[in-house]
A protein has these predicted regions:
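Intrinsically disordered, low-complexity linker/loop segments enriched in Gly/Pro
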Residues: 17-82
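C-terminal functional regions that serve as terminal interaction/effector modules
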Residues: 75-79, 83-207
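Short amphipathic alpha-helical heptad-repeat segments
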Residues: 1-17
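Residues that form generic nucleotide/phosphate-binding pockets
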Residues: 15, 50-51, 133, 172
C-alpha cells in the first residue's frame, strides 16, 4: 500500500472515531497497524539489494533463489542467504522483485560455506565508524569534483589490511550483521558473515 493511501485511511479512521462508528474504525485501525508493520519490515531489510543489476548474460542472478529454509541473492561480489519459512511453491525457483519467475540455474551457493571456520579470524565492525568513513569519502569527492555523489566504486574500507568495497560492505551491514570473518592466511578468499537470521559472504578487493 502506498503512503498516500495510508494517509487517506488515517483520515477516514479519524472521521469514523468522531462519528462514533467504532466497529468500522477498529477495522481500519487493524489495517493501518498491519501496513505499518509491513513498512517497518521492508525498511529493515530488502534482499533485492543483493541481486545483480540488469545483465543480459546473467539473468539468473537478477532474482532471489529459494532453497529449503533459505532464500538467497548474490551479485557475485556479495551474497546473502536469509533463513526463514518460505512458501513451498517457491522452492527451487528464482523470483524477481516483481514476482515473476526467472528460467535459469542458480549457482551452487552452498559451496561457499567453509567446512572449517578455524582459519577465519572474527573482526567486529563498528557501523558508526564505517558510516563516518563513507561520509568522509563523500565530502572529499564533493570538494574534488564540485558535486556530491551517493557512491563511488573506488571507495574502500580497510579491515585488518584487507580492502572491501564501501558500498558492498555497507549493504552487508544492513542485515544487522556486525562481525566479518576473514581467512588469516588466504585473505583474498570471500569473507564470511553470519548471525541467527543470515549467512553471507563478501569478496575483498584485489589490490
Amino acid at each position: 500500500m502506498k503512503q498516500s493511501s495510508i494517509d487517506k485511511l488515517s483520515r477516514v479512521y479519524n472521521f469514523l472515531e468522531k462519528e462514533e462508528q467504532s466497529g468500522m474504525a477498529e477495522l481500519i485501525k487493524e489495517v493501518l497497524r498491519a501496513e505499518s508493520q509491513q513498512m517497518n519490515c521492508n525498511t529493515k531489510f530488502d534482499i533485492y539489494k543483493f541481486v545483480l543489476p540488469k545483465d543480459k548474460y546473467r539473468t539468473q542472478l537478477q532474482g532471489v533463489f529459494y532453497d529449503g529454509e533459505y532464500r538467497v541473492a548474490t551479485d557475485q561480489i556479495k551474497l546473502i542467504a536469509q533463513k526463514g519459512e518460505w512458501p513451498e511453491e517457491l522452492q527451487g525457483k528464482i523470483v524477481k522483485s516483481d514476482g515473476s519467475i526467472i528460467d535459469g540455474h542458480f549457482p551452487n551457493w552452498r559451496s561457499l560455506i567453509p567446512k572449517d571456520m578455524t582459519p577465519y579470524k572474527p573482526h567486529k565492525i563498528d557501523k558508526a565508524a564505517v558510516a563516518a568513513k563513507i561520509e568522509a569519502f563523500r565530502l572529499e569527492h564533493k570538494a574534488e569534483y564540485g558535486k556530491s555523489t551517493q557512491w563511488c566504486d573506488e571507495w574502500r574500507i580497510d579491515i585488518d589490511g584487507v580492502l572491501f568495497s564501501a558500498k558492498h560492505l555497507w549493504t552487508i551491514l544492513s542485515t544487522g550483521i556486525d562481525t566479518l570473518y576473514i581467512h588469516e592466511r588466504e585473505q583474498y578468499r570471500a569473507a564470511i558473515v553470519s548471525n541467527d537470521e543470515f549467512w553471507g559472504a563478501i569478496m575483498p578487493v584485489v589490490k
